[in-house]
Amino acid sequence: MENKIEVNNKDEMNRWFEEFKKGNGLVDTFTNSYSFCESVPNLDRFVFQMASATDDAQKDSIYASALVEATKFCAPIYECAWVSSTGIVKKGLEWFEKNAGTIKSWDESYTELKVDVPKIEQLTGYQQAALKWRKDIGFRVNANTAALSNKVLAEYKVPGEIVMSVKEMLSDMIRRRNLILNRGGDENPRGPVSHEHVDWCREFVKGKYIMAFNPPWGDINKSGRSGIALVATGLAKLAETEGKGIFDEAKKTVEALNGYLDKHKDEVDRASADSMITNLLKHIAKAQELYKNSSALRAQSAQIDTAFSSYYWLYKAGVTPETFPTVSQFLFELGKQPRGTKKMKKALLSTPMKWGKKLYELFADDSFQQNRIYMHPAVLTAGRISEMGVCFGTIPVANPDDAAQGSGHTKSILNLRTNTETNNPCAKTIVKLFEVQKTGFNIQDMDIVASEHLLHQSLVGKQSPFQNAYNVKGNATSANII
């Protein structure tokens, strides 16, 4: 078996794709990037099947079947070919050999991360490594393989018949988000921060230093119920939505304020001025500490970079460019026929290739005690095999034309369009998957609701499985559904 996607750069990729497209009748009516999707998947029968299911194993199987049906033909073929091409496979795997130091903070602790929640440094270390990997190997070939830095969508337009369902999903996502933000593990518990405080901080970091003389709450050093200065909690909250760069802006504003006070020293009480500058810098430092320990940052940093994690798992399993086609074929077959966790683990252990057992050994421990939403994004689970699937299993690289048979992997849904001209097939499909889940399970009792996670990915602006959203600013659950 050999990798037939012999591509090392964008020009070669374009030539390969044009040839492939001619012979395979790809379309982009319902998808952002060309795919085999000729119609929006109909999942109604799975709702009916779920209604009569009697046990969890049966329900899991029905949902797995619905997922495959929903995603079988909608993967972005150009980008999937790029991710599996000979050039990216070679560079993607070699990078890990050369960058042991870059991944050390979490790679060395992999065994512990299989059973326990990561430290915030291990999450941010992962995200920095993912961005470095993308840059170093030249992963970006177009916007669909980019690292995003936009703001979350302010508006999300959906067909009238699913507005209420999307709002129901958002409501549950907000409930979960609040549970996370208010969990007991924060080192710095703090109550809700008012819009007024955040708005003041936003103006202050823009350089309006005179505002420090008279904040709306009175004294610049006033504390809230938590005993923490309101300036600090306001800045920390602002950083959660606008990024940590606001701390540097805040320091610049304080420098400008100090310059103003120096310039007018004859009209200034020096002791009061020095005290104000010292305290403002102290409040900024406290805000940085709050931000670093915040659950919002933890949630943001726990997002999986699908391509980076998938390559990391290949590397850990000892896959080489020569054995890569066997992994690709295995994942392609996995996406054709839905399998439960047990069957999938059995399939991994049954393959004669060494990587099968090694991938199995990478799986998170069943004794992982916490909510699985906190799990490190580099830890492999049965569910996350689908991340590898969308990368390497959409097109079996030894026989690329077989991709026309379809292979379903969850994140392919992000390739479905969200525009109103096509009636937002992405949201419609996600809502139908939610309906399937809701019919069989008590949504409130679930750690992770897969369909809600997909909606969240769509709201942060992802239009492809291969985009990194770590630097996307804002809160996705604030989107206005219209």
Curated annotation (Swiss-Prot):
Membrane spanning residue stretches: none
**Enzyme type, top EC level:** hydrolase
Where in the cell is the protein located?
Virion
What changing residue 457 to A does, per the record, is: Almost complete loss of DNA endonuclease activity
What is one term from the GO cellular component aspect held by the record? Answer: helical viral capsid
Q: Provide a Gene Ontology MF annotation, just one.
A: hydrolase activity
Protein keywords: Capsid protein, Helical capsid protein, Hydrolase, Ribonucleoprotein, RNA-binding, Viral nucleoprotein, Virion
Cofactor binding mode, per the note?
A: Endonuclease activity is stimulated by divalent cations such as Mn2+, Co2+, and Mg2+.
Q: Pfam families, from UniProt?
A: Nairo_nucleo
Cofactor(s) needed for function: Mn(2+)
Predominant subcellular localization, coarse grouping:
virion
UniProt site (Homooligomerization): 213, 267-268, 276, 352
Similarity remark = Belongs to the nairovirus nucleocapsid protein family.
Q: How does it assemble?
A: Probable homooligomer; forms a double superhelical polymer. Monomer.
Note on domains (UniProt): The DEVD motif is a CASP3/caspase 3 cleavage site essential for viral replication in host cell. However, the importance for viral replication is apprently not linked to caspase cleavage. This motif is involved in homooligomerization.
Instruction: State the name under which the record lists this protein.
Output: Nucleoprotein
